[in-house]
Amino acid sequence: MPETQEPASLNERDPMFEREKEKYERPIVSREYILSYLEGTGRPLTLEDIIAELEVAEDDQEALRRRLRAMERDGQLVRNRRGAYGIVAAMELVRGTVSAHPDGFGFLIPEAGGKDLFLSPREMRKVFHGDTILGRAVGEDRRGRIEGAVVRILERALKHIVGRYYADNGVHYVVPEDRRIPQEFAVVEGEGEGLTPVHGQIVILEITQYPDGRNMPQGHVVEILGEHMAPGMEVEIAVRNYGLPHQWPDEVLAEIKQFSETVPETMKAGRRDLRDLPLVTIDGADAKDFDDAVYAEVIENGFRLTVAIADVATYVCPDSALDREAVTRGNSVYFPRRVIPMLPEILSNGLCSLNPHVDRLCMFCEMEMDAAGRSTGFRFDRGIIGSQRRFTYDEVAAILAGDAELRAQDAAMVPHLEALHSLYESFAKARERRGTIEF
């Protein structure tokens, strides 16, 4: 009579057991196996069901409970009304991001693609624009849109809001400036010690209680921006509403202490010296930083063109605090009368700006072009330059148009500007031959 085969232990059934063993002193059932098991059962299971069916030891049951809660928090599982865990897809739930409309309604944008779910103003009272949630389709509205309901909020998009502070008959509340947030916020008394906003001022509120559809959200004032109509207030509001990083982390401030306002002689070694070349910058009249400089001259059968850009990489090392913050910011943001730079001012307006009559490190390309604007040779290199003039677009246009006073003032530069313009015309004709469309 053949021996009865013992059922495989949980350790043998869980394909990720060895990985869990490396991570934990007492390995527990992996997320992958939990998902696979629930998918196989085809029905939601309570914690007690899972413990019994997977034969989880008593000493491991608390760890399993925490794992299930973590999977629920991460949107891998969802609990129904009786506390049973199920797979999101199997329970016909949709994970996505809330997109709010100023008129009070919104949409759930599915992460996996597909049709958006319409969220009524009633459902939107539970969430904010940008929240990550689980939703469920519950039918169609009168316009034929698939209507959704909020099942669970996985991640809140907002921790602070900017709004106008009101104090009416002892009631203190804030109305958000972002019209996509229709809820008013009750101001919690006793918080934000030392801050006493005045009726009508713009404040920053830290959210302490989120809406649930029944109760008013709450928060306490952490910053007073000023009067509603103060000059520049619209910029301050926009910066906060769109979450633009506008303060430098401490590690960035510590890192830039190594820089001086001038380029050290040691950093100039091994670079090609272009300081005698009449490179110039050409930008708008209100430009604050100058990223590139140009020079052109007429040579036999064409032109020689040199384009130099600031050598930012020399100052911003990979994975440094500066590098990480620059990645977070992505680019500089320009407002009327204000710039939020991608790099601290000592770099953006200083060492990495090709200001006139100061030494700057650069990367440059020296190109030779024929009369038709075709490249006949080029080279890239690291160099050091001293821009010889900061031109504006209007000044260059006037010089090329024949302004006698400006041409006399910059007589040494005029031939190079005319060479640049002639080369531009060659490029423009080549573009036209290729069928390029001007917008």
From Swiss-Prot:
UniProt-recorded Gene Ontology molecular function terms? exoribonuclease II activity; RNA binding
Q: Which GO terms describe its biological process?
A: mRNA catabolic process
Q: Where is the RNB domain?
A: 271-439
Q: What are its GO cellular component terms?
A: cytosol
Q: Region (Disordered): which ranges?
A: 1-22
* UniProt-listed InterPro entries: CSD, CSD2, NA-bd_OB-fold, RNase_B_OB_dom, RNase_II/R, RNase_II/RNase_R, RNase_R_HTH_12, RNR_Ribonuclease
Record's keyword terms, sorted = Cytoplasm, Exonuclease, Hydrolase, Nuclease, RNA-binding
| Class of the enzyme per the UniProt entry, highest EC level | hydrolase
Quote the subcellular location field of this record: Cytoplasm
Reaction(s) catalysed by this chain, per the record, are: Exonucleolytic cleavage in the 3'- to 5'-direction to yield nucleoside 5'-phosphates
Q: What is its EC number?
A: 3.1.13.1
Quote the Pfam families the UniProt record gives: CSD2, HTH_12, OB_RNB, RNB
Q: Where is the composition biased (Basic and acidic residues)?
A: 11-22
Q: What does this protein do?
A: 3'-5' exoribonuclease that releases 5'-nucleoside monophosphates and is involved in maturation of structured RNAs.
> What family is it from?
Belongs to the RNR ribonuclease family. RNase R subfamily.
Return the protein name: Ribonuclease R
Which organism is this entry from? Acidithiobacillus ferrooxidans
Q: Which gene encodes it?
A: rnr
